[in-house]
């Protein structure tokens, strides 16, 4: 459920709507609380834009908590009473659409009901319900005017859904008799097919050869063969040998003791059916995997985690270390492959410390001695014999080499005897 606020001046009325409700319900639910006596000539504004009140909330683009202004339409603000319906209602272009038929175009006012539209074109008895802007209206709602559903002006499409046609009793008699006759014919054909199949079965049975059957032999149980003794002890080698059958057991002549011994041997050597199979059971993959995990957990401790690296992990780690050792750093690679070219000149700004500064450009062939001679030429004879040169960060300037090797574009400070920095040095 969404809450929409109907506003008039400083008054605000909350209205709860479902997504399938029309915006006309905002007017119908709030017009009395906002001080209006009639809802027929009221319209909605969202900001400064007029809202189509026939749209469903889910199709209107209005979000939850939106504020809609309720006001009288411009046609009703000409001094007429708001309780009376405006006689100059606008014409609405209506299109009636039946499935499988051409559209019927008609014009109606907002006070016209759906029932009146259908009666004009003799469609009232043929239609069960209609669909307007995605909302279904049943026959009980046909008496309401279009204005009640928010249809005030413009054009509207009404989809008509016809009543399901029911066949009359006279028209049903013919197909019933036809289907009954067809069922009888099908039943007769099925019976004929069953008779033919039974005759074929009898012919097949009679074609088999006939043998005499002895019923007594069929009822007799089959003899169970007793397996021969695998080995005979040395103490019973003198016993007479006799074949073992299902009807008689081996006997020994004229000696009761020997008979007892033979019976004991026969009992001990009869095959016994044991529940345990002589062949080992084939273990399933899941049981083998569970056993391996259990053994690993016992070997590794109570935590159950295997922290020992495998052979493949060790080999991978060693290959990574070899690659890192063979890699050359980017700085050394750039230095060796492409040496930095020396600048063609060096621009130096000399700061003499008393607010005096000179900028001079040296060529790539000038060395540090040339630079010192240039500085000495701008000093007094006393100061030119002893002075020091430093960079802007007071780092001492080299005494040998080319200028472009050490200076590209820099500030050089000149320290004389009167300079306290020179005295400290």
Swiss-Prot record:
Polar residues bias spans: 236-254
CC per GO annotation: cytoplasm; cytosol; nucleus; vesicle membrane
Outline the segment boundaries, as ranges, of region: Disordered: 224-257
Gene Ontology process terms (BP): intracellular protein transport; ubiquitin-dependent protein catabolic process
Under the heading Pfam families, the entry gives: TUG-UBL1, UBX
Q: Which function does this protein serve?
A: Involved in CDC48-dependent protein degradation through the ubiquitin/proteasome pathway.
This one is known as UBX domain-containing protein 4
Q: Which gene encodes it?
A: ubx4
